[in-house]
Amino acid sequence: MARTHILGFPRIGERRELKFAQEAFWRGDRTEAELRDVAAQLRRRHWQLQADRGLDTVATGDFAYYDQMLSLTALLGALPRRFGLDPARLTLTQYFELARGNREQPAMEMTKWFDTNYHYLVPELDAETTFDGGPAWFFEEADEALALGLRARPVLIGPVTYLWLSKSHVAGFDRLALLPQLLQGYRRILDQLKARGIEWVQIDEPALCLDLEPAWLDAFDTAYAALREAGPKLLLATYFDTAADHAQRAAALPVDGFHIDLVRAPEQLAAWQAALPAHAVLSLGVIDGRNIWRTDLRRVLDTLRPVQAALGERLWLAPSCSLLHVPVSLAHEVRLDVELKSWLAFATEKLDELSVLGRALNQGDAVVAEALAASDAAQASRRASRRVVNPRVQQRLAAVSAGMADRASPFAERIERQRQALQLPLLPTTTIGSFPQTAAIRQTRAAFKRGEIGALEYLERIRAEIAVAVRKQEALGLDVLVHGEAERNDMVEYFGEQLCGYGFTENGWVQSYGSRCVKPPVIYGDVYRPEPMTVDTARYAQSLTERPMKGMLTGPITMLQWSFVRDDQPRATTARQLALAIRDEVCDLEQAGIRVIQIDEPALREGLPLRRADWDAYLDWAVTAFRLSASGVQDQTQIHTHMCYAEFNDILPAIAAMDADVITIETSRSAMELLEGFGDFDYPNEIGPGVYDIHSPRVPSVQAMERLLDRACEVVPPQRLWVNPDCGLKTRGWEETEAALANMVSAARALRARLSARGATTWKRLSKPAAATAAAVPHAGNACTACATHAN
């Protein structure tokens, strides 16, 4: 009999109950007891969903009040010492302070969970870190499930993955030195679970899918030799990529079963079947835990039946990874059109699919004939739908030539024509795109969406906001202006709503971090642009000023990364379709007299595969997509791109290959350290390193920004340097925005004056160096949360 289980379930609730309870607690409108009660209700509901569908075990420990890595850090007692907290007496208020900061301490660092759009809190480790235990929440959740008569299977992030994802701020400290002490903490956890009669514990080790050095591979041997002496059976779970090259070594570990991801890496099945010990179970992740499309159940059954014949009761079935990454339920999607809805499966529907697969294998197809027929019908509907495949889009894709991804002239020639056309000063000043989204702007958009105001009144209100933004920029003395994006709710959804091939859910929320949830749009079919999207707005904004006005677009890779993407064609193909749609908009903006066009790609690095061997293939099609979107214009039209806070050094050749005339990047929090890689690489085009942090309400001084510009000029010649904030200003208020931009313009003018006075054509230090005031902080490969504004 094949067993069924899941690796984890979304914790937010089908109506985002956890989010609203968290935020009420933070405001002081709910007590800790009331928040705990909401959490307990959600856990019971989610366990019952699993039990009602006949799953053999229910996942416990997958719940977290903020983040599972933070909860594990608390469970182990490894809290950052700078907070001065007693792990054994940790309250929820203190737990949230670790994630959100307090008056004395900034929050723990947050970064992406592997290559997903979920964020985790990074443990802070050093030689004095201890793992003596913390609050009993993890065990209490297992007790809750057991008290309900359920077979609980607690879920833990494994010790090697935990160390791999941690950081130390002590130079040269080897995190693996903590492994012996960490394993003692894990053994105490497993001992307590054994005492409760727990049969199986799931230990997640997705790090086994990464490029690991020998010392880290050896750590698996050490870790599981130690944990074998503890009680419950261990299911070692891998996901997000293949672990086939480590299958032989992993199979020798003293564990009782393995989970592998057959959605991301179906080719690894043979290697694991060959390596699997005779006693071990093999859990196959056959339902996509990261996307929202219904599973082709008959195709999966064709894969599973030979495995069942070989393994019998040692075969387990599961989603590919935790269902954390998909919305909770389709039940509340009342406005989604019937056809598109029939193609989708959220977390609850994926439980149904899993149940059908288990029953088909164990009892025969006849028992689930109706469900299999519905699956067949959904697959046939997608294949046949005229909404999915558009002949004109296919013809246009086939006609794309290599030359379409190239500008007419090399950068050295283009930039001279652009300088003549734009007549900008040395160190031109600009912003990244968005300006403060005031309550009035949000109310206007909401009123229009609800039908309370008509299209004409909406347009008049938005144009009034644009006029305000233009006047403020001119008064500040900025050189290249933006319209402020008052009409945009989100940098992906705004464009997706105007592109064919996109759909939108009402309640398709997934957790990004903490209480922040995102509702990604759905790319279900061939993408194309039926009509211009931003041209009228840009033309109006340009009519208000003689200074250059930037057209503002979201790039094809960011549109791809921040959506649920169709799974019936390669992502590279969808990226090319997006690129052609954006290319049309770029060309129309140029025809409308827009001389500077920005194509934002904050998510470019996020798309990198987990293994470096796969990077080149991804970067090739991703860069080509950007170039295809940007290369239809004349030489004198200047193309900008923006990338958020990320580690760029290892992909600088790809960034240079994008061939944007100007790239703006987020650098102020690293005190311009991120810029040094561009200098070492001799980045050939123009660059605008951010000179102040838009995530903070603090207004930096003129002198502080001058110091950052001085440092930037040591890396990039002033003739190729732009002056701008780190990112868009949507989340800030006008008072702080105007003050900060005024200081930024003053800093640029002061540096211009110093350069002019010295007659400098190349940079030499013009003043005694002073330490930059922006403190360097660790950075990760993420777009900043200011860009990911489709959240709530």
Swiss-Prot record:
- Pathway(s) where this gene product acts: Amino-acid biosynthesis; L-methionine biosynthesis via de novo pathway; L-methionine from L-homocysteine (MetE route): step 1/1
| Binding site residues for L-methionine | I432, G433, S434, E485, D600
Q: What NCBIfam families would the database entry show? A: met_syn_B12ind (TIGR01371), PRK05222.1 (NF003556)
Lineage of the organism: Bacteria, Pseudomonadati, Pseudomonadota, Betaproteobacteria, Burkholderiales
**Residues annotated for 5-methyltetrahydropteroyltri-L-glutamate binding in this entry:** R16, E17, L18, K19, K112, R516, C517, W562, E606
What's an example of a GO molecular-function annotation for this chain?
Answer: 5-methyltetrahydropteroyltriglutamate-homocysteine S-methyltransferase activity
Annotated residues for binding of L-homocysteine = I432, G433, S434, E485, D600
As to how many cofactors bind and how, the note says: Binds 1 zinc ion per subunit.
Superkingdom of the source species: Bacteria
Indicate which residues the UniProt annotation says bind Zn(2+).
Answer: H642, C644, E666, C727
Which keywords does this chain's UniProt record carry?
A: Amino-acid biosynthesis, Metal-binding, Methionine biosynthesis, Methyltransferase, Repeat, Transferase, Zinc
EC assignment: the record states: 2.1.1.14
Which reaction is recorded as catalysed by this protein? 5-methyltetrahydropteroyltri-L-glutamate + L-homocysteine = tetrahydropteroyltri-L-glutamate + L-methionine
Q: What is this protein called?
A: 5-methyltetrahydropteroyltriglutamate--homocysteine methyltransferase
Task: List the active-site residues.
Answer: H695
Name the protein family: Belongs to the vitamin-B12 independent methionine synthase family.
Keyword Transferase listed: yes
The record's annotation in CDD domains points to:
CIMS_C_terminal_like (cd03311), CIMS_N_terminal_like (cd03312)
Single biological process term from Gene Ontology: methylation
Q: Does the keyword Chloroplast apply?
A: no
| Annotated gene | metE
Cofactor(s) listed in the protein's UniProt record? Zn(2+)
Q: What does this protein do?
A: Catalyzes the transfer of a methyl group from 5-methyltetrahydrofolate to homocysteine resulting in methionine formation.
